């Protein structure tokens, strides 16, 4: 495939639904079963460390399973043999064909057409190399990816800055440095990056004049005074009490812009808050483990009915989180991709190509009007050798949150807040 001009969408020969790549490679059943909730096991590993950080004080944490899934799914399209098998297992799909039909992959396509959400994807390939037509087709058809040649060999810093600029533009400046300094060098062959941006307005906004400061109780027993959003009159909300915790569903206004081609709404987003009971019987870390390891936990614990609310207090918060995923992915069974796997389906002459690092960064702000959130995942690939009872929901202590697409159950953002004042 000839080198592509800067910003030019991928083009290539027409293929079938699998983009002309093999779909018969099967993931190990045990791994696929463990990870079928779309990269949530990775979120479990990273979230555990965040909860234990700071000598017990913890650290606010957010990750985008959707962004991470999309990045590794595209890498899987270019992998072959055992390398692809491991990636499919990590992504929770038994085959490449099933991966292409997954709810997360379908939602990614819809995000590009919604007024308040966006998904952008790019691939940068060294000028001396070429993407295979099959991989080019897969990237274009499923992710509307744009390709740019990059001079990694002689100007790696300039190439890094270009990737970061792409992500910054796609996230409206919320994420500016997904690739840190020295993350690419002359041995870099390919960088794949995506960006998710979400802006949701509450269907029932909070009035700023009602916001007040009150203590938020920290994990170490201390407290900080934080701004709490509330309502001045009793009303009904989607709230439910479960053993050890209470769940609150805060829907966003329908940003789907009507029905999709299949006759159903394109998207219906909401934020789910899971608040451990104040008696301390269920720890934040234990609730988080349940959320990321139990199949359909978030869906099953999303309140389905409205109930009267006596008191409603939700803190405003704003923070960012970033991490490198290679070590955690190794723990979860992905090894060949980092040690010189088979990526012959991605780049011509792809022998010895390996994933050097996977970078992820996410940010979120929640206030009286709604939520603004963004995330980016970048994969750097190098060449070897080169009428219910009333319920209270007073979130004055650490809690979990998730931004979820209701129709598919796909999790766009997942995290916890241990201090709403910490950025």
Swiss-Prot record:
The name on file for this protein is Putative serpin-Z12
What task does this protein carry out? Probable serine protease inhibitor.
Sorted alphabetically, which Pfam families does this protein's record hold?
Serpin (PF00079)
The protein's UniProt keywords, in alphabetical order, are:
Protease inhibitor, Serine protease inhibitor
CC annotations in GO: extracellular space
Q: What terms describe the molecular function in GO for this protein? A: serine-type endopeptidase inhibitor activity
InterPro entries reported in the protein's UniProt record: Serpin_CS, Serpin_dom, Serpin_fam, Serpin_sf, Serpin_sf_1, Serpin_sf_2
Q: Where is this site: Reactive bond?
A: 384-385
Gene3D superfamilies named among the record's database cross-references? Alpha-1-antitrypsin, domain 1, Antithrombin, subunit I, domain 2
Q: Does the keyword Nucleus belong to this entry?
A: no
Q: Where is this region: RCL?
A: 370-394
Q: What does the sequence similarity comment in the record state about its family?
A: Belongs to the serpin family.
User: Quick one: where's region Disordered?
Assistant: 1-25
Originating organism: Oryza sativa subsp. japonica
What the entry says about domains is:
The reactive center loop (RCL) extends out from the body of the protein and directs binding to the target protease. The protease cleaves the serpin at the reactive site within the RCL, establishing a covalent linkage between the carboxyl group of the serpin reactive site and the serine hydroxyl of the protease. The resulting inactive serpin-protease complex is highly stable.
Note whether Nucleotide-binding occurs among the keywords.
no
